[in-house]
Amino acid sequence: MPATSFYADAAYNTQKSRQALDPDIAIDDSDLSVDEIQELEIAAADPATFGASANRRSTDLVRLYLQEIGRVRLLGRDEEVSEAQKVQRYLKLRIVLANAVKQGDEVATPYLHLIEVQERLASELGHRPSLERWAATAGINLCDLKPILSEGKRRWAEIAKMTVEELEKMQSQGLQSKEHMIKANLRLVVSVAKKYQNRGLELLDLVQEGTLGLERAVEKFDPTKGYRFSTYAYWWIRQGITRAIATSSRTIRLPVHITEKLNKIKKAQRKIAQEKGRTPTLEDLAIELDMTPTQVREVLLRVPRSVSLETKVGKDKDTELGELLETDGVTPEEMLMRESLQRDLQHLLADLTSRERDVILMRFGLADGHPYSLAEIGRALDLSRERVRQIESKALQKLRQPKRRNLIRDYLESLS
């Protein structure tokens, strides 16, 4: 059963498209009504709707999962509004904390860093991490963990102009409401995932990716708009699934943002070819996509052409290409990803101050491949260990802004 995190970062990139990545992958279900979506939710709870071709073990897992999510009843309209309001109140508190960090608050900065580390670990593990693992991942001593959390929460309450008790109550209500909304809509995730079976991912993998989309929908849903949550969540669920399919469908995996641009170019090529009866030029594509010809060319150049390892080479065509390639070292896929990542890292780090850039390069081994400890960096730059940690935290906060963070996250997911 897919693990679901209820502690993910609230600051998602609001400019991500709700459209499917590839018209060849997408299903034309854009006209589904609210009633039809709710019917899908109910139908998804019936194990009989799954084909008999799946192996028994997989079918049993699916049946157990459906039975578990079927125990959670669907939310009524008023319940959706009430739960969503609690989630939004909590997320507004998170924005208050994030703004304080942006302004350089020395107490709020390490506190927010710890919270983000905990949420990331919870997402990866499927449960909250131990204090030891939490502290180690955050790069601090275990004895410093509780003081930072205690002081940080007091500072957060002070900034939000409320008591610590009021803050904790609102935080608890927000997280519980978020979890409730996710669990109550998992049947919708299954119903959407079923439409994308036999495309390279198992059903439960599709459900897991769709659940991540559902989580984003919960955080972004505005109950004052007047529409049902299932209508809004459907698009986020679908996007999560289609992005996963697009990522896994390539022999050489490209960053998702490159895949999205490539799919837009393909769609524009088909449209222009149909309208003008000829192969579109770079200029045609640039006009259609509101890009420059250079930008279109750069996207196309990042897409490698596949060559079969069984291709016959040599004068007598008696040798296969695969026999001439070394098996050790960096693979072509890794080389492509690292070169592309290096180019974008240079642009990313250009926004930092020179000292912040030096700390990040040394801390993560981006310059020479050797990561340095805070103490080692402090000795090299003639700074205290605590000052290095503060500089690192401030630099990472800049790099975590959605427009930058999501770009690098795509690369890291592909490299891993």
From Swiss-Prot:
GO terms for biological process: DNA-templated transcription initiation. Keywords: DNA-binding, Sigma factor, Transcription, Transcription regulation. A motif (Polymerase core binding) lies at residues 205-218. Gene3D superfamilies: RNA Polymerase Primary Sigma Factor (1.10.601.10), Winged helix-like DNA-binding domain superfamily/Winged helix DNA-binding domain (1.10.10.10). Pfam families: Sigma70_r1_2 (PF00140), Sigma70_r2 (PF04542), Sigma70_r3 (PF04539), Sigma70_r4 (PF04545). Belongs to the sigma-70 factor family. Sigma factors are initiation factors that promote the attachment of RNA polymerase to specific initiation sites and are then released. This is RNA polymerase sigma-C factor. The gene is sigC.
